Design a protein with these regions (language model features):
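Acidic, Ser/Thr/Pro
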Residues: 25-312
């Protein structure tokens, strides 16, 4: 075998993950090259500061939401088939639920402003404002320059889960979505039903535009029902079997007119693999509701920030 062929073979073979060594006092992903300075402990003892404290963000009117939920009626539903994606629309002031119906199943959620697809969910800022996992009361913020809430979580039957002893939580905004490019990078295999691919096809069908044209619109997701976190030793992204069971749901208020796209992840409950046909997969149900209480709902305005009229 030539060196070139051997090199390609080594590059394309899946890498084996070695169990980490027991962590030291200061956990590290790589063996350090440089010695710690004499004041290392003092430097590491600096106080933690929350980067974006959200307390000044006006909260939703909890009484209004309670009244809306009490009077809501289902007006539509969309079934998302296993290893596929579907789109749905919700008017501002409406509510929608993502429901587990047949078995544990993770869903990858994209949200867009229905009238301007360039305004879409921004997982990074949502994570910075609300943390790594979302639940009741947390909002899903849109991209710059709009930076407004697209949706707010109004109910979550998995809110009891919290964070487990592995550091795992449910409904994360840290994972990007499974995609065929990363799958090929790691395994040299082509798989066409990753959530990225499913979402791209669904948005293409909805808009009537070519898949290659809409692909850049597909963005980092909210991983609905997915149980994830960062390992305690190396801080690597991990997943474990979702605690979701049939009948569980997460519910949202649409703060603007929304286009949603949801993929039923090929990983099923994501307790093992996520980019193959190996896992048992189940459909997800999207239920759309309206409430007369919300008929006068005013969508959240875009950011009031304005660039200066002259150079600064």
């Amino acid at each position: 075998m030539t060196q070139a062929l051997l090199r390609d073979r080594v590059r394309c073979e899946p890498r084996r993950t070695l169990l980490p060594e027991p962590p030291t006092i200061r956990r590290m992903k790589h063996e350090p090259v440089h010695p710690a300075p004499s004041d290392a402990d003092q430097r590491a003892a600096a106080p933690v500061v929350v980067c974006y404290p959200p307390e000044t963000i006006p909260p939703l009117d909890s009484d209004l939401i309670a009244a809306a939920r009490a009077g809501m009626a289902k007006v539509d539903e969309v079934v998302v088939s296993p290893r596929e994606a579907a789109t749905f629309e919700v008017s501002a002031g409406g509510l929608f639920r993502i429901v587990s119906v047949e078995g544990p199943q993770v869903g990858d959620l994209n949200l867009f402003h229905a009238h301007d697809l360039s305004e879409r969910f921004w997982s990074g800022k949502t994570r910075a404002l609300h943390g790594t996992h979302l639940s009741t009361g947390d909002r899903m913020w849109s991209t710059l320059p709009h930076l407004r809430p697209l949706a707010t979580v109004t109910d979550d039957t998995l809110d009891w889960y919290g964070y487990d002893t592995d550091g795992g939580g449910v409904h994360d905004v840290i994972g990007t979505r499974c995609d065929p490019y990363t799958q090929h990078l790691l395994t040299c295999m082509d798989y066409h039903y990753c959530c990225h691919s499913n979402l791209t096809r669904a948005v293409a069908r909805h808009t009537g535009r070519p898949e290659r044209e809409v692909e850049p619109l597909v963005h980092d997701v909210m991983n609905v029902f997915m149980c994830t976190g960062f390992t305690l030793d190396t801080h690597q992204y991990f997943m474990k079997a979702s605690p979701v069971r049939p009948g569980d749901h997460i519910e949202f208020l649409a703060e603007v007119d929304l286009l949603g796209a949801l993929s039923a992840c090929p990983g099923g409950d994501c307790g093992d693999e996520h980019s193959s046909d190996t896992a048992a997969c189940h459909p997800l149900l999207v239920e759309i509701y309206e409430s007369p209480v919300m008929e006068s709902w005013e969508p959240a305005p875009a950011s009031a920030y304005r660039w200066p009229t002259r150079p600064v």
